[in-house]
A protein has these predicted regions:
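Alpha-helical transmembrane segments and their helix-start/interface "positive-inside/aromatic belt" motifs
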Residues: 77-85, 137-151
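Hydrophobic core segments of alpha-helical transmembrane domains in multi-pass membrane transport
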Residues: 1-3, 90-101, 117-131, 149-162, ...
Length: 306
């Protein structure tokens, strides 16, 4: 339904600008319809893969999940700090998506041209969050509810088709295909949090050393590890974090969240050869975001001390 709607509205405008409409789906998280939308709209399969997996796993996930969920869970003290971290992560977003795009097989010239709308949207988000945070958050929540509603309708239609054999929407993927992807995500999730816990125990001393160097306590350094598994535990722990820890962990979530969990499981289920591009893009973008947040907080704390 979304694909058909875009075909008659925004897609002609994209083609007029010589941009591949496959990039449009990148505003949705890859596992919330972004990947399928990119693949359906793309003129070049490589652009569909890049938009659906790399952009959808970073910018799309931030728009449809991380921001609305984070702002809904956090208190008044944490919200401005969380927003500052998201701004830092968005500033570093080009690093992650360019690395991922190159590993998807795109030339640097094509990558830069096709990514222009993504960069523009990231700039608009940065301006909006810094100047009109309350209005932006309300907009994100409404957008997320629309996506959830569309997903619920899709599940209902898929279930009806599965039980009756009547295909109401010929272009819609079958329920069996969707459940296969969900199973792949579930299998990866089974071991992801235990994996993060094992890493925390094995790397306790190195993590403490890194934390001392960048000014993070135990909870802050643990959040950087848990964040690559899931955003939810990290956001929940932010109520107990200090300012620097909140900002740096929020910055990581823009590109790094679910890197070794839901996003990895999804890509293994739909396009396994793109796994390397996904991991490299999310890792480099996440590290760049944390570094950007670290620099911002050093300047903020330095100016405060004067």
């Amino acid at each position: 339904l979304v694909s058909l709607g875009l075909e008659y509205t925004i897609v002609p405008f994209y083609r007029m600008l010589h941009l591949d409409p496959g990039m449009l789906g990148g505003i949705l998280a890859l596992d919330m319809g972004g990947y399928q939308l990119c693949k359906e709209l793309a003129l070049d399969p490589a652009i569909g893969r890049y938009g659906g997996i790399i952009v959808g796993a970073t910018l799309g996930c931030t728009i449809t999940f991380t921001i609305p969920v984070g702002m809904g869970m956090l208190g008044e003290r944490e919200k401005p700090l969380f927003a500052k971290g998201i701004l830092a992560g968005l500033s570093a977003l080009p690093v992650g998506i360019l690395v991922g795009g190159l590993l998807c097989g795109l030339s640097i010239e094509k990558l830069l041209i096709q990514s222009l709308p993504v960069f523009l949207l990231a700039v608009l988000l940065i301006l909006g969050l810094s100047r009109f945070p309350d209005g932006m958050i309300r907009g994100f929540r409404v957008f997320a509810e629309i996506i959830r509603g569309a997903g619920t309708i899709g599940i209902a239609l898929g279930a009806f088709s599965y039980m009756t054999g009547v295909q109401l929407l010929p272009e819609m993927a079958g329920l069996d295909e969707a459940l296969g992807v969900v199973s792949s995500i579930g299998i990866v999730l089974l071991g992801s949090l235990p994996f993060a816990e094992i890493l925390q125990r094995l790397l306790k001393k190195p993590l403490e050393w890194v934390g001392e160097k960048i000014g993070l306590g135990r909870l802050g350094t643990a959040g950087l590890l848990v964040g690559i598994v899931s955003a939810l535990p990290v956001i929940a722990d932010m109520k107990q974090m200090n300012e620097r820890e909140i900002v740096m962990n929020a910055a990581l979530l823009v590109c790094g969240t679910s890197m070794v969990a839901a996003h990895l499981g999804f890509v293994l289920g739909v396009d396994a050869p793109a796994t390397g591009a996904l991991l490299a893009g999310k890792l480099t973008g996440g590290i760049a975001g944390v570094w950007m947040a670290w620099q911002i907080m050093k300047k903020t704390e330095s100016s405060r001390d004067r």
